[in-house]
Amino acid sequence: MSDEEHHFESKADAGASKTYPQQAGTIRKNGYIVIKGRPCKVVEVSTSKTGKHGHAKCHFVAIDIFNGKKLEDIVPSSHNCDVPHVNRTDYQLIDISEDGFVSLLTESGNTKDDLRLPTDESLLKQVKDGFQEGKDLVVSVMSAMGEEQINAIKDIGTKN
């Protein structure tokens, strides 16, 4: 037995991985992939034939799902790539704070107050205008690799 103290860093997640491995050759257009540490949606995949030295290669062109930037990567088709766990959840919009955060109602009846307004100008305008007009709005929140962002909005009628 030692007299040393053990310090453990507590983490918010339950240890679930933010990504899972998938063979590059099986990733298709409209699928997801991690490029340069960012979760992306694949917009184009091309495969080169096996050369004199080496494997067939997959050329991925993808768009970052949070900031919209275009990223590219070339991976041997037999190698594994990281694929992000992407979740989409709908919440009802309750309030917009002055500091740019939204208050959302979860399915369980709790509030979620840790999400910022969207950075996309047209989506931001839709959210603000709809809220000011007193509409009942449902926002779609995409989450992947520890990031969350509002990416769509639905009008479910006017508040009574």
Swiss-Prot record:
Lys-52 undergoes hypusination, a unique post-translational modification that consists in the addition of a butylamino group from spermidine to lysine side chain, leading to the formation of the unusual amino acid hypusine. eIF-5As are the only known proteins to undergo this modification, which is essential for their function. Keywords: Hypusine, Initiation factor, Protein biosynthesis. SUPFAM superfamilies: Nucleic acid-binding proteins, Translation proteins SH3-like domain. Pfam families: eIF-5a (PF01287), IF5A-like_N (PF21485). GO terms for molecular function: ribosome binding; RNA binding; translation elongation factor activity; translation initiation factor activity. Residues 1-12 have a biased composition (Basic and acidic residues). The keyword Protein biosynthesis applies. One of its GO terms (biological process) is positive regulation of translational elongation. Belongs to the eIF-5A family. Translation factor that promotes translation elongation and termination, particularly upon ribosome stalling at specific amino acid sequence contexts. Binds between the exit (E) and peptidyl (P) site of the ribosome and promotes rescue of stalled ribosome: specifically required for efficient translation of polyproline-containing peptides as well as other motifs that stall the ribosome. Acts as a ribosome quality control (RQC) cofactor by joining the RQC complex to facilitate peptidyl transfer during CAT tailing step. This is Eukaryotic translation initiation factor 5A-3. It comes from Solanum tuberosum (Potato).
